[in-house]
UniProtKB/Swiss-Prot annotation:
UniProt subunit comment: Tetramer of two alpha and two beta chains.
List of residues that carry N6-(pyridoxal phosphate)lysine: K82
InterPro entries reported in the protein's UniProt record: Trp_synth_b_CS, Trp_synth_beta, Trp_synth_beta/beta-like, TrpB-like_PALP, TrpB-like_PALP_sf
Lineage: Archaea, Methanobacteriati, Methanobacteriota, Thermococci, Thermococcales
Record HAMAP family: Trp_synth_beta
Protein name listed in UniProt: Tryptophan synthase beta chain 1
Organism expressing this protein natively: Pyrococcus furiosus (strain ATCC 43587 / DSM 3638 / JCM 8422 / Vc1)
Gene3D superfamilies tied to this protein: 3.40.50.1100
Cofactor(s) required for function per UniProt: pyridoxal 5'-phosphate
Pfam name, any one: PALP
Length: 388
């Protein structure tokens, strides 16, 4: 329920029952043999796990410092780590006897992952999306519809992600007997941050075995980008007790912290309550949630998962920022040096790893969680960079 003082269940009375039911079901099925057999089967044959741990030799040589390894979550079916959690929760919902999935989505990635998992398991899928985002993300809307999902534009409020979340919650309260609300990151009220972390920690478990096989030792540093924080939590969690491994989360510095145009909740936010949890949020003096900015649509979230807030507080993980400009540079660098086009989100982690590697010795090791591929971002990069 709590990560130190962070997390909790700050929700209206009407949500207590569905959350209790979910917690009970998760406790029951998470170690269930048949549930895990099916989950592992789908992760392997449908999602393409395990993903490789790749030594970025040319990038390493170019920088001339620590060895850089990439955990290739960009190779998961669907193109990002989101699939790990979507299939996990969808299968859990199926085991609970639910027939319908709902989710909210901003940039559309989580909506697509939910639609994919729903199609795989034969479940009805409704996706809430701010009307403004529906306009901005036409391809992902089309993708969701192709996968059989129904996309519901939300016209209230700022017509963006936070309004979509409100609508999804309203729906869930009224329909939870047959509906599962599939949250896409390590955020929201308990038990969601724990459930999502557990389904994502397959990343870190694989990476640990793979680096031991490749190098015979654990890495010195693990670097991952942090929006809500699920890809980072997924790779961090299996290493939390390995105190020698430094964990670094990279937030979206946008146009710089002083500009106010960023999404760096842990670096520039305050502790508050939003989305059913106590964590760090970007808020003004009145406690209102501030608008966020990042070149990477998936980092554009005004808060962060409570377990990250806790890891920061106990100083087990360090959180830094990378600007739009630095991320773009890394996006081009990785594409040209290794033949891998990263998502702009992941490019934030690559940028910081490149900076860090320079200051480290050649026998040290960095693992970067390459959380997604960059196909979805080509439009953005084209607009910003003009011709390459």
């Amino acid at each position: 329920m709590w990560f130190g003082e962070f997390g909790g269940q700050y929700v209206p009375e009407t949500l207590i029952e569905p959350l209790k039911e979910l917690e009970k079901a998760y406790k029951r099925f998470k170690d269930d043999e048949e549930f895990n057999r099916q989950l592992n089967y789908y992760l392997k044959t449908w999602a393409g796990r395990p993903t490789p741990l790749y030594y970025a030799k040319r990038l390493t040589e170019k920088i001339g410092g620590a060895k850089i390894y990439l955990k290739r979550e960009d190779l998961v079916h669907g193109g990002a780590h989101k699939t790990n959690n979507a299939i996990g929760q969808a299968l859990l919902a199926k085991f609970m006897g639910k027939t319908r999935l709902i989710a909210e989505t901003g940039a559309g990635q989580h909506g697509v992952a939910t639609a994919m998992a729903g199609a795989l398991l034969g479940m009805k899928v409704d996706i809430y999306m701010g009307a403004e985002d529906v306009e901005r993300q036409k391809m992902n809307v089309f993708r969701m519809k192709l996968l059989g999902a129904n996309v519901i534009p939300v016209n209230s409020g700022s017509r963006t992600l936070k309004d979509a979340i409100n609508e999804a919650l309203r729906d869930w309260v009224a329909t939870f007997e047959y509906t599962h609300y599939l949250i896409g990151s390590v955020v929201g009220p308990h038990p969601y941050p724990t459930i999502v972390r557990d389904f994502q920690s397959v990343i870190g478990r694989e990476a640990k075995a793979q680096i031991l096989e490749a190098e015979g030792q654990l890495p010195d540093v693990i670097v991952a980008c942090v929006g809500g924080g699920s890809n980072a939590m997924g790779i961090f969690y299996p290493f939390v007790n390995d105190k020698k491994v430094k964990l670094v989360g990279v937030e979206a510095g946008g146009k710089g912290l002083e500009s106010g145009k960023h999404s760096a909740s842990l670096n520039a936010g305050q502790v508050g309550v939003f989305h059913g949890m106590l964590s760090y949020f970007l808020q003004d003096e009145e406690g209102q949630i501030k608008p966020t900015h990042s070149i990477a649509p998936g980092l554009d979230y005004p808060g962060v998962g409570p377990e990250h807030a806790y890891l920061k507080k106990i100083q087990r993980a360090e959180y830094v920022t990378v600007t739009d400009e630095e991320a773009l540079k890394a996006f081009h660098e990785l594409s040209r040096t290794e033949g891998i086009i990263p998502a702009l989100e992941s490019a934030h982690a690559v940028a910081y790893a490149m900076k860090l590697a320079k200051e480290m010795s050649r026998d040290e090791i960095i693992i970067v969680n390459l959380s997604g591929r960059g196909d979805k971002d080509l439009d953005i990069v084209l607009k910003v960079s003009g011709n390459v």
